């Protein structure tokens, strides 16, 4: 079907009703042809008196009536006397209000804006405007119309006004000059625009496909893209091959560009087992810092723990049970070693061991900081230990000054604690762990707790796996399932999954079930379980208690399709219920939503009065209210309320169904795991294991038995390129460890 043609209106901006300067979303009135029209859309920056041509469509807003939703907007500098006066009187420029606008018009008439742009010294003829003020007025005028010019320029390359504004903020008034000289700057930090946009601009300027800027940008983009997939580095040959396939240039040409990047230290190279690995500099620095600090902790003399065995016996008498041999070993090492990895599957006593260590540390009056990578994991750690726990970000105190993430606690402002216990270690990426260990005092110890069989972090690195693989950091792996945990089929089957043994079938009173289904029938089954069967049989709240965890986003049982179906079933569109459209998503009051990328600036208010900042990837909440006028939403996440303005709605996704990857560090009362259609690259044991172990009271696997068998039979973990194990071994050679 042919795309419907956009309607067009033109006229003069009469009034600005609403403006968001961060993302360029505006609501304004346009007067033309004797009609005043309310226009809304992301248009950049407009002011009263400007001439505009808007293209889009009329929409009927439930609250505000008929509006014109602009998808494109062209502007022109005010030209006639009335429009020039309206612009000056709108207070768009510093030091100029209605009275000063009258004086400027009296002196310069319709040429006033030409004077401001090209001969600001003449403004000093106006009483009250000094030479300094005249220069400031010109600077703001050029900034305003420079941004407008850039928005129009980049629009021809399909770059949105919002992204164009980001480009202007990055490069300033010289943005067009910088981009025309090297369009591939747009693909780098911090913008990371799509490579095709840069290619379009480069073709416009007749730049060759094998120019140095394009080759170097392709190498950097390939490394950044793979960092997003978890790799901290890539083998040289794989980097060249991947970049070659991406931009269709021979590897030989890219090799020359790579050598130049290494020479200028834009990229770094390390040799591991005779193979050169290429790094982005910040990721190599992160792994080197981690290796150096862990080696220092391991080399440092052990701590004395007088009467430790007696104190463990007293704990056993107090608790009314005896610790298993491996638990005792872990407790002893936690009290004597400067760093320790404690790992094990569900039901093996990690929490019991950590609580014992906490009690002994507190008996010695040691200051302990408990932390985890996500808010949900920190909350769970607090519940399990009965002590305050925080996210790593909260512990270090995020500082987002100037749009750059840093932490108040760092190597110059160390944490005031003696021991850090870090839970869910498998989720921690290299940059965050680098920041944490940098903030530890020389005498501070660290205990890293996690399940090595779970999926690695969403961000780059595989820290827990690499530390264990190095064999050089003290590690205790708990492997005994305790009696109370054996009553749970969730726990029992989790261990069957890891060992590759057949799953145990659940009976009526069990907590694990497999329901066979396929395709659209599997989708209907999942929806029926969420909306009807589980709430009726177990009393679960379908939104707050039940979580669908999907291996993939695509297909009938992927997150995208299931969220559409579940939203329509659990929270359908209703007259009078506010909703917002953001890209392809519709948000309604009552929807379950998830934060999908870190926002270090968003303000939250805790119910009870405390205020703070930050929402992090994986945080889940409920939409409490929607303001359709300014397109903002209030979301409640546990005991916090956050206001999401229009420009931040892209950080949220509907979350009735989420991916297994996004569920890391969380637990849910009931989990439904659809495995009817799983792409081969996601068909592996660790992903299935991670999904099952997110369930606290009930786990239902719905899908095909052959898919389950393939997942359990595929022991391939997601291969992640990382040099941390090699760097640790270089810092702490095995023979030195054995000699000690």
Task: Please give the residue ranges for each predicted region.
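Structural detector for short beta-strands of small beta-barrel domains
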Residues: 5-20, 56, 620-624
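Accessory alpha-helical DNA-binding modules that contact the DNA backbone or grooves
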Residues: 4, 25-31, 38-39, 47-58, ...
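Conserved helicase motor core of SF1/SF2 NTP-dependent helicases
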Residues: 356, 360, 364-366, 372-384, ...
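Hydrophobic anchor at the beta1->P-loop junction of P-loop NTPases
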Residues: 342, 370
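Short aromatic-glycine-enriched beta-strand elements
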Residues: 19-29, 629-634
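Pre-P-loop entry segment of helicase/translocase ATPase cores
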Residues: 155, 214, 224-228, 269-332
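Conserved helicase motor core of P-loop NTPases
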Residues: 452-613
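C-terminal accessory regions
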Residues: 607, 617-740
């Amino acid at each position: 079907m042919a795309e419907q043609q956009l309607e067009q209106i033109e006229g003069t901006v009469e009034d600005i009703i609403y403006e968001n300067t961060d993302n360029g979303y505006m609501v304004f009135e346009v007067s033309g042809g004797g009609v005043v029209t309310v226009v809304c859309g992301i248009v950049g920056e407009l002011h009263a008196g400007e001439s505009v041509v808007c293209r889009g469509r009329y929409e009927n807003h439930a609250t505000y009536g008929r509006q014109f939703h602009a998808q494109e907007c062209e502007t022109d500098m005010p030209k006639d006397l009335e429009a020039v006066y309206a612009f000056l009187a709108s207070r768009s420029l510093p030091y100029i209000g209605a009275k000063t606008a009258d004086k400027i018009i009296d002196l310069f008439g319709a040429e006033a804006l030409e004077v401001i742009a090209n001969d600001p010294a003449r403004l000093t003829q106006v009483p009250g405007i000094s030479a300094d003020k005249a220069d400031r007025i010109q600077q703001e005028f050029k900034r305003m119309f420079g941004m407008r010019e850039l928005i129009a320029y980049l629009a021809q390359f399909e770059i949105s006004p919002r992204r164009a504004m980001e480009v202007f903020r990055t490069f300033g008034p010289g943005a067009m000059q910088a981009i025309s000289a090297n369009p591939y700057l747009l693909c780098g930090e911090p913008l990371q625009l799509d490579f095709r946009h840069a290619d379009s601009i480069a073709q416009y300027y007749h730049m060759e496909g094998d120019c140095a800027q394009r080759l170097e940008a392709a190498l950097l983009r390939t490394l950044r893209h793979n960092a997003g997939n978890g790799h901290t580095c890539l083998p040289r040959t794989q980097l060249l091959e991947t970049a070659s396939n991406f931009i269709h240039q021979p590897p030989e040409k890219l090799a020359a560009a790579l050598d130049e990047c290494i020479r200028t230290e834009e990229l770094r190279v390390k040799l591991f087992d005779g193979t050169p690995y290429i790094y982005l500099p910040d990721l190599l620095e992160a792994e080197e810092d981690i290796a150096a600090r862990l080696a220092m902790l391991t080399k440092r003399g052990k701590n004395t723990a007088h009467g430790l065995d007696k104190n463990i016996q007293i704990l056993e008498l107090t608790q009314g049970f005896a610790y298993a041999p491996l638990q005792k070993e872990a407790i002893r090492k936690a009290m004597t070693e400067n760093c320790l990895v404690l790992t094990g599957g569900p039901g093996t006593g990690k929490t019991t061991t950590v609580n014992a260590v906490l009690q002994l540390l507190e008996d010695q009056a040691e200051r302990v900081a408990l932390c985890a990578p996500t808010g949900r994991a920190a909350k769970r750690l607090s519940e399990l230990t009965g002590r305050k726990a925080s996210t790593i970000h909260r512990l270090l105190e995020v500082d987002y000054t100037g749009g750059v993430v840093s932490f108040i606690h760092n190597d110059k402002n160390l944490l005031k604690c003696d021991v850090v216990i870090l839970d869910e270690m498998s989720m921690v990426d290299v940059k965050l762990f680098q920041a944490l260990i940098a903030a530890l005092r020389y005498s501070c110890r660290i205990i890293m707790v996690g399940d090595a069989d779970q999926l690695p972090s969403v961000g780059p690195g595989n820290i827990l796996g690499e530390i264990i693989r190095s064999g050089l950091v003290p590690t205790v792996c708990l492997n005994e399932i305790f009696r109370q945990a054996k009553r749970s089929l969730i726990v029992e089957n989790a261990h069957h999954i890891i060992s590759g043994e057949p799953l145990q079938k659940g009976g009526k009173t069990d907590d694990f079930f497999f329901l066979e289904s396929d395709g659209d029938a599997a989708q209907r089954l999942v929806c029926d379980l969420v909306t009807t069967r589980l709430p009726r049989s177990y009393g679960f709240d379908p939104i707050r208690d039940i979580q669908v965890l999907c291996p993939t986003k695509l297909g009938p049982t992927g997150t995208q399709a299931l969220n559409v179906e579940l939203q329509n079933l659990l929270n359908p569109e209703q007259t009078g219920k506010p909703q917002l459209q953001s890209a392809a998503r519709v948000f309604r009051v009552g929807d379950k939503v998830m934060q999908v990328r870190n926002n270090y600036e968003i303000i939250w208010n805790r119910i009870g009065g405390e205020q703070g900042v930050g929402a992090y990837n994986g945080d889940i909440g409920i939409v409490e209210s929607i303001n359709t006028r300014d397109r903002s939403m209030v979301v409640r996440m546990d005991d916090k309320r956050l206001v999401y303005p229009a420009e931040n709605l892209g950080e949220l996704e509907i979350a009735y169904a989420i991916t297994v990857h996004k569920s890391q560090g969380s637990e849910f009362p009931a989990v439904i795991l659809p495995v009817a259609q799983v792409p081969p690259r996601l068909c592996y044991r660790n992903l299935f294991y991670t999904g099952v172990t997110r369930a606290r009271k009930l786990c239902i696997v719905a899908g095909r038995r052959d898919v389950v068998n393939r997942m359990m039979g595929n022991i391939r973990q997601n291969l992640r390129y990382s040099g941390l194990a090699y760097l640790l071994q270089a810092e702490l050679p095995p023979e030195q460890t054995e000699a000690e």
